[in-house]
């Protein structure tokens, strides 16, 4: 090789010594690391100032874990302080950290675990399992319920740390860090900096953020305050703006500080606010990065910039959707989803889970009734459905179906003056009229939003001619009988319509075009009536006679299957729990 060719190829090679690799715990081959990065590993390690611990492995998540919205809120505890306290409390379900997707600062609080009476049932189960397959399944119990920093052990990309106040149990996949001799704020800020990401790229090159790699992170305290309170505050507020947070209060579109005369103007105001929040978060994250870049002396290796896709707020479409969509496509998707969330919240108000007159959950316990609602909201502006069955049909067959109820809800929340404009904005955002959205897309969206553990269930005939929603937490043994009565009422309406269309067909004075149209309607109606007859005879009536009893503690997966083919099938519902 010529001297010139040798010079040209040198730029493709890194020079590093084996002695440098030995400076890093585990001696990984980080050939690209600079001298300053190697030097950082001479500092104290995270294990010297904090404890990084794995949590429990239940060995049967399907039995012991639930998404928090599946069970009664009064049976759920989010603020237990110790194992001793859990021994005395009456609740069955306790906040449980299970890792989750890439999200910094706050969030992914979705699960609860059966820890009734200090985990009596789970401890007994694990004791039996250990006789067959010994193993530490309930690890590090002295750390249960303590304030901590959690992270996802397995990741498809960047590391992310989140704050947990006291009250959580935790999983092997949702490992936690407990500060000892370092400030919680400093450690938390450091872990979410790009400096720590650079260290983890060396320590955990496979993106399996094990406690071994986490414990080896070099630790230095900065010489100036970190902006962690602002970062955490923004992240928590964003998480709590959505129904899947147990601290959800109300829909941002209905917050008084965003409210404008029209829904369109309100959305524009909200979107401007969310842009501002995202930009502020980006500036704060960059400030945080710079603080730790300076602390470690890595100014030549790293810059403080943060890609907009890494600002982990749900109101940020670049993070929420990612991919290669254009700005216009991202904005359209966010607008459509925000309006879909408005419709979802409206359905929650129709069933009494929420109220426009009271923040947070209203009816969220097994067997809750309208009377329970009225005790909490004595003079509601929007009255929930009385019998817990709301028809969801593609025509105006019932005055109280989901579409008509939504129109009332829209008038209550945004007034009569701009009603038509508001409805037009909703339909433009969704790309279809409201009735079509409810009949074609709402349930799919709901199942996805609630992670295949829906709280509103859809009774549906095989081809969807008849469908009706119920709210799981208000289910009673006679609920299926109420659905059956709606089906029979609907069948009668279809039979009457069939007679009307048949009259047109045989009317000698009717125009031929009208006769042709009527004949097509007759053929469709006959098929629909047969479908409804089959659904009643083979499915709904037999189920109604069984008076099936459900227990929310059994979870949506088990309970949904108890009503069998009366409900719309959910693909993947029977998949094994993670």
Segments from the language model and where they lie:
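General structural signal for alpha-helix termini and helix-helix connectors
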Residues: 216-219, 507
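Structural motif corresponding to the C-terminal cap of alpha-helices
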Residues: 195, 218-221, 235, 354, ...
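Terminal accessory regions of large proteins
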Residues: 252, 279-283, 290-293, 297, ...
């Amino acid at each position: 090789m010529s001297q010139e060719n040798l010079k040209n190829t040198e730029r493709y090679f890194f020079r590093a010594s084996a002695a440098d690799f030995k400076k890093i715990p585990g001696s990984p081959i980080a050939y690209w690391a600079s001298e300053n990065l190697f030097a950082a590993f001479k500092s104290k390690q995270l294990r010297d100032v904090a404890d990084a611990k794995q949590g429990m492995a239940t060995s049967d998540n399907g039995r012991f874990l639930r998404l928090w919205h599946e069970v009664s809120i009064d049976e759920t505890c989010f603020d237990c302080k110790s194992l001793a306290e859990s021994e005395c409390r009456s609740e069955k379900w306790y906040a449980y950290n299970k890792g989750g997707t890439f999200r910094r600062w706050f969030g992914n609080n979705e699960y609860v675990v059966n820890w009734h009476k200090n985990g009596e049932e789970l401890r007994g189960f694990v004791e039996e399992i250990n006789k067959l397959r010994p193993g530490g399944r309930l690890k590090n119990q002295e750390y249960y319920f303590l304030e901590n920093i959690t992270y996802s052990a397995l990741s498809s990309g960047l590391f992310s740390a989140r704050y947990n106040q006291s009250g959580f149990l935790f999983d092997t996949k949702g490992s936690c860090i407990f500060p000892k001799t370092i400030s919680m704020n400093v450690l938390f800020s450091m872990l979410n900096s790009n400096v720590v990401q650079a260290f983890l790229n060396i320590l955990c090159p496979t993106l399996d953020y094990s406690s071994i790699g986490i414990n080896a992170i070099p630790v230095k305290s900065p010489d100036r305050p970190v902006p962690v309170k602002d970062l955490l505050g923004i992240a928590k507020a964003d998480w709590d703006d959505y129904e899947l947070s147990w601290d959800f209060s109300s829909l941002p579109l209905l917050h008084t500080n965003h409210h404008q005369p029209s829904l369109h103007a309100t959305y524009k105001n909200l979107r401007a606010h969310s842009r501002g929040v995202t930009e502020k978060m980006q500036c704060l994250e960059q400030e945080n990065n710079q603080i730790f870049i300076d602390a470690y002396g890595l100014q030549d290796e790293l810059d403080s910039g943060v890609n907009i896709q890494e600002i982990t707020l749900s109101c940020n479409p670049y993070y929420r959707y990612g991919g290669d969509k254009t700005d216009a496509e991202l904005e359209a998707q966010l607008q459509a989803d925000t309006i879909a969330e408005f419709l979802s919240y409206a359905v929650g108000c129709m069933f009494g889970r929420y109220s426009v007159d009271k923040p947070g959950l209203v009816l969220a316990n097994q067997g809750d009734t309208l009377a329970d609602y009225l005790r909490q909201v004595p003079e509601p502006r929007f009255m929930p459905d009385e019998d817990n069955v709301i028809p969801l049909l593609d025509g105006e067959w019932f005055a109280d179906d989901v579409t008509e109820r939504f129109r009332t809800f829209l008038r209550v929340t945004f007034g009569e003056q701009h009603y038509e404009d508001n409805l037009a904005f909703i339909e433009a955002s969704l790309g279809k009229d409201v009735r079509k959205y409810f009949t074609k897309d709402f349930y799919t969206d709901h199942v996805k939003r609630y992670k295949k553990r829906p709280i509103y269930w859809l009774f549906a005939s095989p081809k969807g001619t008849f469908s009706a929603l119920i709210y799981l937490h208000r289910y009673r043994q006679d609920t299926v009988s109420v659905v059956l009565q709606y089906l029979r009422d609907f069948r009668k309406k279809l039979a009457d319509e069939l007679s009307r269309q048949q009259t047109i067909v045989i009317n000698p004075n009717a125009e031929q075009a009208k006769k042709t149209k009527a004949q097509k309607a007759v053929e469709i109606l006959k098929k629909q009536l047969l479908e409804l007859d089959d659904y009643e005879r083979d499915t709904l009536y037999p189920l109604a006679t069984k008076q099936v009893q459900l227990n929310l503690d059994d979870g949506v997966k088990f309970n949904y299957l108890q009503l069998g083919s009366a409900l719309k099938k959910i693909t993947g519902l029977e998949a094994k729990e993670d």
